Amino acid sequence: MQEFDVAGVGRFPTVRMRRNRHHRWTREMVAEQHLTVKDFIWPVFVHGGPEREVSVPSMPGVVRYSLDAVVDAVGHAVELGIPAIAIFPATDPSKKTTLAEEALNPDNLVCQALRSLKQAFGNDVGLLADVALDPYSSHGQDGIVRDGYVLNDETLEILLSLIHISEPTRLSW
């Protein structure tokens, strides 16, 4: 490899000068990312039961909110400066089917939560929802399954319908 002199630096590429990052202030000065609360989307889990908050055992510190508690929880997040939330349902197992029909119910947990939040906050908070079938399917797959295979075309048709039933909430996506 050919070396050449760089004024004030020395022989490049043998000597490659770089900014010293030993001190916190220099690391912060040259950091590529500066994350703030305004960069986050809070995942909010909702359930249809009577308890306002239900712990999620697999995620310590995370709770599922009832439909009447989710507005208060999101209100606190808005006060903290969190600009957007994403709603994820904990669908009652009795409503889960192989064809995930509950996904297309305009009164499913996600639709109810989004309507309440839109009414409470208008456009002051971004509202997102996962366009997915796994919360509604009895087999846990994110698609329609027949004979062990996910049927992509049939799944896409249902996902498009899912988007359309969410449209009245005017999601921020």
Model-derived segments and their meaning:
Residues 35-62, 128-150:
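N-terminal small/glycine-rich loop or linker at the start of catalytic domains
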Residues 130, 163-173:
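Single conserved hydrophobic/aromatic residue that forms the stacking wall/gate
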Residues 107-115, 148-160:
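Acidic, His- and aromatic-enriched active-site or binding-groove loops in soluble protein domains
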Residues 2-52:
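N-terminal amphipathic alpha-helix/helix-capping segment at the start of soluble metabolic enzymes
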Residues 69-89:
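Catalytic domains of carbohydrate-active enzymes, especially glycoside hydrolases
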Residues 54-64, 82-109, 136:
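Glycine-rich, proline-tolerant flexible connector loops at the mouths of alpha/beta enzymes
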Residues 37-40, 81-83, 121-125, 170:
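Short, well-ordered coil/turn segments that N-cap beta-strands
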Residues 98-129:
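Alpha-helix-loop-beta-strand connector modules within alpha/beta enzyme cores
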